A protein has these predicted regions:
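A gly/proline- and charged-residue-enriched helix-loop-helix capping module
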Residues: 90-124
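N-terminal basic, low-complexity leaders that serve as flexible interaction/assembly modules and, when applicable
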Residues: 1-80, 84
Length: 124
């Protein structure tokens, strides 16, 4: 599903109308998101590639935006670094990031496959 306006913008090709997308476009206001949320947790929507893709594409279909934004959470890489992320209802870490432990946490290696669900969602 290639969008010409977006591809042209990436190629710096002049056009009469720029591509349109919004951050958090699959938000709480959107009925498509609300319907998915009644059957799935936030984490399920993010970590299931098919659900993440469906969530991201909802606003494209409803509002005719030009570009979809990956439906995910910015905190998942920190979870992969061993910080123990849970949602109840909002995000909570098992350990806090401090000046004292930041060097150790950010120098941890992690299996990049722990974030494979994000790449799989993009492929859909």
């Amino acid at each position: 599903m290639t969008n010409k306006k977006f591809v042209n913008a990436l190629g710096k090709i002049p056009q009469s109308v720029p591509p349109i997308w919004f951050m958090r476009q699959a938000g709480r206001y959107h009925s498509h998101y609300q319907n998915l949320k009644t059957k799935n947790t936030f984490v399920e929507l993010c970590k299931s590639p098919s659900l993440a893709a469906e969530t991201a594409l909802g606003p494209i279909e409803s509002f005719d935006f030009d570009v979809a934004i990956l439906f995910s959470d910015i905190l998942f890489p920190l979870e992969s670094l061993g910080m123990g992320l849970t949602y109840s209802p909002g995000p909570k870490f098992d350990q806090l990031l401090t000046e004292e432990n930041s060097h150790e946490i950010f120098n941890n290696t992690f299996d990049v496959n722990s974030l494979a669900f994000q790449g799989e969602a993009l492929e859909r």
